[in-house]
């Protein structure tokens, strides 16, 4: 309950950003979620073996990862494979979350981030719009549907500018 309160208190206000290792924070969130998900979902986590520093708010970053993972699990109807892959470029880091779910039609790639858009029977369609707001407005990153194929799955991609520790 405290985590939820912390997250929502940061939305709408200017969150405090910290220079942190995005790999460690992402991995910790994924490991936490893995313990709370059906054994029918297999997780794969791949990342460089060294820290990559980005300016972000840890509670909000964790929430974006959690939302993307939960959406992926919903799309797979609770069973399938979930791959989280972090790659480093010269100035950026990319986080890709790939599922083996139902896929998203190409004409809905941008719509999935609109408030109120949902394909689920439950929910308000706010998760991805809040995720986009956190990634783009607060963390100055980018988020998109990188690839999706109906009946095969989807890859969501976030990218963030790297920073140096001073």
Question: Where does each model-flagged region fall?
Answer:
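Short beta-strand-loop-beta element adjacent to the nucleotide/active-site pocket used for signaling
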Residues: 82, 87-95
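Short alpha-helical Gxxx[C/S/T] motif in the catalytic ATP-binding
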Residues: 127, 131-132
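Conserved DHp (HisKA) dimerization/phosphotransfer helix of two-component histidine kinases, i.e.
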Residues: 1-40
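Short conserved segment of the HATPase_c
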Residues: 104-116
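Glycine-rich ATP-binding loops of the HATPase_c
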Residues: 139-147
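Detector for a conserved hydrophobic position within an alpha-helical segment of the HATPase_c
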Residues: 135-136
């Amino acid at each position: 309950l405290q985590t939820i309160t912390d997250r929502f208190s940061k939305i709408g206000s200017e969150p405090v950003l910290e220079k942190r290792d995005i790999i460690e924070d992402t991995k910790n969130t994924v490991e936490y979620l893995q313990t709370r998900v059906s054994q029918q979902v297999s997780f794969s986590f791949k990342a460089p073996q060294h820290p990559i520093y980005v300016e972000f708010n840890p509670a909000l970053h964790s929430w974006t990862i959690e939302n993307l993972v939960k959406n992926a699990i919903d799309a797979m109807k609770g069973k399938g494979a979930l791959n989280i892959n972090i790659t480093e470029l010269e100035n950026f880091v990319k986080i890709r979350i790939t599922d083996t779910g139902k896929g998203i039609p190409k004409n809905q790639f941008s719509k999935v981030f609109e408030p109120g858009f949902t394909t689920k029977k439950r929910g308000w369609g706010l998760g991805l719009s809040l995720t986009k707001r956190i990634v783009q407005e607060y963390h100055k990153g980018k988020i998109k549907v990188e690839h999706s194929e109906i009946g095969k799955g989807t890859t969501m991609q976030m990218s963030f500018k790297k920073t140096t520790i001073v």
